Amino acid sequence: MPKHLAKLHENGDIYYHDLDSYNLTVNCLNIDTGRILQRGFNTGYGTINAPKRIESAAELSCILLQSTQNDMFGGQAHVNFDNDMALFIPNTRSEIRKEILENLKGLEVQEEVLNKEKIDELVEERLRLRIHQAMQGIVYNLNTMHSRAGSQVPFSSINIGIPKDKDAALICEIFLKEYEKGLGKGEQPIFPNIIFRVKEGVNREEKDPYYYLFKLAAKIAGKRMNPTFMNMDSDFNKEYYDKGIIPATMGCRTYVCSNISGEEGPAGRGNIAPTTINLPRVGILAKKDINKFFNLLDNRLELARESLLHRYNVLKKLRVKDLPFVVGEGLMKGSENLLPDDSIEPILKQGSWAIGFIGIAETLTAL
């Protein structure tokens, strides 16, 4: 790193996050969970086939988070968890129905016992039980399974609340209820961060079809301080929602939707690297001169940009084989046609490079 950039970090003017990973990997990722699960994946020891049942899909969704975190220094999110898990409900339902009919076959039962409505009712009852078990497994796994050489559990986030059908709504409801229960003795689950998305016409108002999910989420937030809520009707979210893109975020609030290098949307994208400007110091140095403050801030912003470009040029020297899961398995947008010895530069153009700040209240006090 150039000395003038290194000095900024050493002096506390600009903070470069996760220096120990500076030349090794990138920050975080929104996983296109449904797509990856439906095609299967390889964590390095062999191929994992696409799951057929909700229990398998739930378990493998945790493995996706864990394996992704082993390749990165930040967090991971399922961008559309309830809809993605719902993909595996029809097969599970069919399997349950087949089991029930096989058990009834050959038994002497009254005709009304075989009534289609009663069988449907029994199928849905057993389906709910299996979904409960699958969602409980997710809560348990994400608070116990370790990644990064055992140093922590995956920093996981799950986006829910905009179900495309009744199966997705069922996943959303049961997942929230299992999270509310907590761990084995009712302990607070630290993970996953849950982001419940609120949208007019979907779940915001009492007249909306999935309002009951919003009410359930609000009730659980009052008890568990989780989920947090994302307003799909805000201008910057509605712009994408109206295009058919459902915005998503992470517990750390990484938000990636716009894209100057390709297709918009969060899936397969995330933050590559962040920097943070020490804003109170800028306010103090300005000595209550607002023009001087903005001149100093412009200087800090330019230096932060320069530091990110330096990091970009360092990271583009990495090869696909250096990040074998997130890039080698095509989880990150831009990695689709790359070979093991190719540069990872295409994925660096698909994520955000963040310049943030700290201490706005203290800055205003100084000014």
Tell where the protein language model's regions lie, with residue ranges.
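Conserved catalytic cores of very large enzyme subunits
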Residues: 1-350
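Contiguous, well-ordered alpha-helical segments that form the cores/surfaces of helical PPI scaffolds
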Residues: 353-366
